[in-house]
């Protein structure tokens, strides 16, 4: 799955959390973050800290791969 926005990332977090029958409070406690952080993350708030966001994803079993895109002048 290719994610292109913080809203898509948040929707994925929410979907997987619900599939695992976890409340926002459960997930927050498991990740040592506030419930407010989980709420903001699931809403796609762009200012959520990356390290915390990736920790939440990892706790849910979501894995990511990063790929470098070619620069514009390299595509020619």
Task: Label the model's feature ranges.
Residues 1-7:
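Short, Lys/Arg-enriched anionic-surface-contact patches
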Residues 3, 58, 65-76:
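Short, charged recognition helix plus adjacent turn
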Residues 11-30, 55:
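Short basic helix-loop element that most often maps to the first helix and adjoining turn
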Residues 32-46:
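Recognition helix of helix-turn-helix/homeodomain-like DNA-binding domains
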Residues 45-57:
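Short, basic-rich loop-to-helix N-cap that marks the start of a DNA-contacting helix
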